[in-house]
A protein has these predicted regions:
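Generic protein-terminus/edge-of-domain signal
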Residues: 1-61, 68-69, 260, 285
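A hydrophobic/aromatic-rich effector-binding and dimerization subdomain
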Residues: 2-16, 70-131, 155-160
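Hydrophobic, aromatic-enriched interface-forming segments
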Residues: 134, 138-179
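Basic/polar phosphate-binding segments, predominantly the helix-turn-helix DNA-binding elements
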Residues: 158, 163-172, 184-228, 250-276
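Pre-recognition alpha-helix immediately N-terminal to the DNA-recognition helix
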Residues: 177-184, 229-236
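Short amphipathic helical patch at the helix-1/turn junction of helix-turn-helix
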Residues: 189-190, 237-242
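Short, basic, alpha-helical segments at the C-terminal edge of helix-turn-helix-like DNA-binding modules
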Residues: 225-234, 275-286
C-alpha cells in the first residue's frame, strides 16, 4: 500500500475531465495526481483525509483538492450507494498560458486558493447546479459552464483544508508507510491506539515513527488522531445527538475519559460539545 501517483483517465478529444462515481466504496487508496480536483458529494457521508487534516463530508458538500495533494474520500456506509461528481484539470489543460491571459486574471485567485484546498461554505446552489449539469454538456457549453463555476468559486466563502503543502511527489517507500498509517488509524481510531501499536504497522520504532509522521504531516501522530476522533464526534453530534448521550458519543469516538473529550473538543472547536449541538440547531445561548 502506498500513496498512489494516480493517473486520471482522460477521454479522447476532451480537455476537461468529468467523472461521475456511483459505487458503494469510493476509491479507497490515499493518492495524489497532477490535476486540481473539484468534487461535489451528491450522496454520501464520511471523512476526507487531505494533507495533514481530516474533514467530515455529507450530502451537498463541495471540495477543491490541490494539485499533488495526497487525499482520500472514505465514505461511512458501505451498504448504500455513494455518489459524487468530480472535475479534473491542470493549469495547462486549455494551453500553457490559458490561465495567464490578461482577460482571465481574476481566475488566478482560484488557482492560488486551490493549492491548500478548500471547502465551500454557505450557499452552494449555483455551484451544485453547475456540477450536476456539467456531465451532460458537450464541448463549448461545458467549457462555458466550467468557467462560470470557477468564477462562482472565487466569490464563495471558503474554509482551507490543509496548511501543509506537499512536494510534488512522495517517495514510494514513504508513501507506502503513510498509506498504511492512515488506513490503520481511520479503521481503528474508535479503539485504544498507542505508539507501539501504530509504529508496529510500519515496522518502525516509536521514536522514529514520531519523527517520520511529524515530517510528513507537520503535526504529531496524536494531534492527528485526536482531530480524527473529534471530527467523528461532530458527525455523531450532528446526526444522533437526540439518540446518544455525549458520554456515548465520546466513547464511540475513541475517548475513554469524558473530561478529556470535553477538553479536546473545546480546544479544537472553541465550544463544549453540548454548546456545539445547540449551535447546529440554531439555539442561541441564554
Amino acid at each position: 500500500m502506498k500513496v498512489h501517483p494516480f493517473q486520471v483517465p482522460k477521454p479522447l478529444h476532451q480537455n476537461l475531465i468529468v467523472q461521475v462515481d456511483r459505487e458503494f466504496v469510493f476509491y479507497n487508496k490515499l493518492h495524489q495526481h497532477a490535476e486540481i480536483q473539484l468534487t461535489l458529494i451528491v450522496k454520501a457521508t464520511g471523512k476526507l483525509i487531505i494533507g495533514d487534516s481530516v474533514h467530515p463530508f455529507k450530502d451537498g458538500d463541495f471540495f477543491v483538492i490541490g494539485s499533488h495533494s495526497p487525499h482520500l474520500f472514505k465514505n461511512d456506509r458501505l451498504d448504500d450507494m455513494a455518489h459524487k461528481i468530480s472535475i479534473f484539470f491542470t493549469e495547462t489543460t486549455f494551453g500553457e498560458s490559458f490561465f495567464a491571459l490578461p482577460d482571465l486574471e481574476e481566475l488566478q485567485a482560484f488557482i492560488n486558493a486551490s493549492k491548500e484546498g478548500f471547502k465551500v461554505l454557505g450557499n452552494r446552489d449555483a455551484i451544485h447546479k453547475a456540477m450536476i449539469t456539467l456531465p451532460s454538456l458537450e464541448k463549448l457549453d461545458r467549457f462555458i459552464c466550467f468557467i462560470q463555476l470557477l468564477k462562482n468559486l472565487i466569490n464563495a466563502d471558503k474554509k482551507t483544508l490543509t496548511n501543509f503543502v506537499y512536494p510534488k511527489k512522495i517517495g514510494s517507500s514513504q508513501g507506502e508507510r503513510m498509506r498504511t498509517i492512515f488506513d490503520y488509524v481511520v479503521t481503528h481510531f474508535q479503539n485504544e491506539i498507542d505508539l507501539n501499536m501504530a509504529s508496529s504497522q510500519v515496522h518502525m520504532t516509536p521514536n522514529a515513527f514520531c519523527k517520520f509522521f511529524k515530517q510528513h504531516t507537520n503535526k504529531t501522530f496524536f494531534q492527528f488522531l485526536i482531530e480524527l476522533r473529534i471530527e467523528h464526534a461532530c458527525q455523531l453530534l450532528n446526526r444522533e445527538a437526540d439518540q446518544l448521550s455525549i458520554l456515548e458519543i465520546s466513547e464511540q469516538s475513541g475517548f475513554t475519559s469524558i473530561s478529556n473529550f470535553n477538553r479536546q473538543f473545546k480546544k479544537l472547536k472553541n465550544v463544549i460539545p453540548s454548546r456545539f449541538v445547540a449551535q447546529q440547531k440554531g439555539i442561541k445561548p441564554t
